[in-house]
């Protein structure tokens, strides 16, 4: 089991390899803000203790480690098949499955095979993000895979943390003339039923419970 110190060490190693904070967030399945916090904690300074005292803000997130699935092709196939099963109710008109890079790409391959659709790949803006406004950056669809071309699409990713990346992908598909029909993830840390009028399915919903959590925030979980 990983603790925060392990995550800080992992973040430091990824940063040393040249990954952006957005890519680190993707690798560790945490928000961009949490990834930034982890990287900052991996670079101690002489006044780190006084800085922490003056800035009590801490990261609030849930780390999801599904590497036991991702490193084994058979387990990955089983999970992908379960995700495809969640989408069965949407009918047979959909002919394109979009995987959000990086982890969503491998999952989407299984989903596309199960549902007999073409396969597309989307690289989100967060992979370029280090600091500042992410709205100034843009994602892109890979030209090595199927293009949107006015098609109905499923969207596949491993985790929803804030929903920003999934929302971005939905918007990108619409901007390209496609129609997002449904999204599916392994783990949803927001517990959302839909984003931008597109239904969201998940194998696992995770709810963080704090002492100050409002009852209505967990009433449906």
Swiss-Prot record:
Q: Where is this region: Disordered?
A: 35-59
Q: Which GO terms describe its biological process?
A: pyrimidine nucleobase biosynthetic process; regulation of gene expression; UMP biosynthetic process
One Pfam assignment: Pribosyltran
- Name the keywords, alphabetized: DNA-binding, Transcription, Transcription regulation
Give residue spans, biased composition: Polar residues.
42-57
Q: Does the keyword Cell wall biogenesis/degradation apply?
A: no
Extract the InterPro entries matched here.
Answer: GcfR_halob, GfcR-like, PRibTrfase_dom, PRTase-like
The UniProt GO MF terms for this protein read: DNA binding; orotate phosphoribosyltransferase activity
Described by its record, this protein's role is as follows: DNA-binding transcriptional regulator that functions as a regulator of central sugar catabolic pathways.
| Domain characteristics, as noted in the entry | Contains an N-terminal DNA-binding winged helix-turn-helix domain and a C-terminal regulatory domain (or effector binding domain) resembling phosphoribosyltransferase (PRT) domain.
Family in the record: Belongs to the purine/pyrimidine phosphoribosyltransferase family. GfcR subfamily.
* HAMAP family reported in the protein's UniProt record: GfcR
Protein name as catalogued: Transcriptional regulator GfcR
